[in-house]
A protein has these predicted regions:
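Flexible, glycine-rich active-site loops centered on histidine and acidic residues
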Residues: 2-16, 70-117
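Structured beta->alpha junctions
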Residues: 41, 65-68, 72
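Glycine-rich loops and low-complexity Gly/Arg-rich segments
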Residues: 29-32, 59-63, 85-89, 117
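Generic secondary-structure boundary/loop-capping signal
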Residues: 56-58, 62-65, 108, 112
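Structural motif
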Residues: 37-38, 64, 94-96
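N-terminal beta1-alpha1-beta2 module of alpha/beta enzyme domains
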Residues: 1-61
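Short amphipathic alpha-helical segments at helix-loop
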Residues: 33, 64, 102-106
Length: 117
């Protein structure tokens, strides 16, 4: 059985970053398999994982999800490659279309035909 924890806007309100880091480091030490970083309103999915890659040894670091509406494909590929490198191959790329509230409300883009990008 795989065990995972989640961080990001759905799980974290930004009050104490050090507490979240300690939580993830403890999870890594206890053998938790994955940490998934979400994005919506607030923190993005990528920056926390880059920081946590330097603080952890074994836990896999995944985006759950990285929104395709706010990034062009080459930037997604470059970001994934960078995270793969700094995490010693522990990065897992999760992509998604998000929803109209975030895509239109936060990013100002149309949500119509989100996979046509």
């Amino acid at each position: 059985m795989k065990v995972a924890i989640g961080i990001g806007s759905a799980y974290y309100n930004g009050d104490d970053w050090n507490e979240l880091v300690d939580y993830t480091v403890a999870a890594d030490t206890m053998g938790v398999d994955y940490v998934w970083s979400a994005e919506a309103w607030g923190m993005d999915a990528v920056v926390p994982l880059a920081y946590l890659a330097a603080k952890t040894q074994h836990i896999k670091l995944g985006t759950g999800i990285m929104q395709i509406s706010s990034r062009v494909p080459p930037m997604i590929a470059m970001t994934a490659q960078s995270l793969r490198t700094v995490s010693n191959n522990r990065f897992v790329l999760g992509l998604g279309v998000s929803g109209p509230q975030v895509v239109e409300g936060l990013h100002g883009a149309s949500f119509a035909q989100p996979l046509a990008r």
